[in-house]
Amino acid sequence: MAVMLALLALSMLIFPAVTMDAAAQACRLFAGSVLPGLFPYMVVSSMLLRRMKPPLPALLILLMGWGGGSPAGAKLIHAAGGLPSRQKSRLLIACSALSPMFFLGTLAKWLASPVCGGIALFSVLTSGCLAAAFAGKGLSTLPAKQENHRSLSLQEAVESSARTMLLVCGMTVFFRVCAALLIPPFPQGRGVILPVMEVTAAVEYVCQLPLPPGWKTALVSGVAGFGGCSLMMQNRSLCP
């Protein structure tokens, strides 16, 4: 691991233009596509969740997680508390899709079709539910942990959500830079490197391909359903 980190740091120093350009692109994409839809919902949903009496129904947590998408869903699931480990894991899998506002807003604009954005959203949510149903059979069950459950003020909710958004931005920038440094040695692997590393950059790349809308929608659904390292690490950080 130390060798890999040293090589990564050296690559950043040798290719500063690539590093800075990738980081700038990630920040622009985050500010224009992720932050506007995710931050306001995260503030409101966190305040709402903490004003409900636990234990909360799993269906309610699932619906709220779907509304925010990933990683807001992971934060809500962790904040809910009182969930057995198996149920918690299944909810995390089912809520691993990106925000509906990303699909119906940003993605629909990139594909020039709200219908395609809706189809992609439905596909990702359905596949997440199926994966959660099958994955839950092999998960061990641990007793629920009772969390400290008190109401959040607006100031606390905004502060907590802002810290979360900083984490999301940081992960997005880091993995976008990693992808940018890997692509020049393996130019033919761009279509694999981006989905593995950073999902929003991969979705943007797919939308720019000279393909029919149906193919783009199918590819975007697969890429968004997988999530990539950036989204996985965000979820792991917010719901350990």
Predicted regions: what they are:
Residues 5-18, 23-35, 39, 121-186:
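Selected transmembrane alpha-helices and immediately adjacent juxtamembrane segments
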Residues 6-9, 26, 30, 43, ...:
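Hydrophobic alpha-helical transmembrane segments of multi-pass small-molecule transporters/permeases
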Residues 13-24, 47-54, 105-115, 178-187, ...:
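Transmembrane helix-loop junctions in multi-pass membrane proteins
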Residues 38-60:
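Juxtamembrane transmembrane-helix boundary signature
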Residues 41-42, 89-147, 172, 176, ...:
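Alpha-helical transmembrane segments of multi-pass small-molecule/ion transporters
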Residues 154, 158-224:
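Transmembrane helical segments that form the transport core of multi-pass membrane transport proteins
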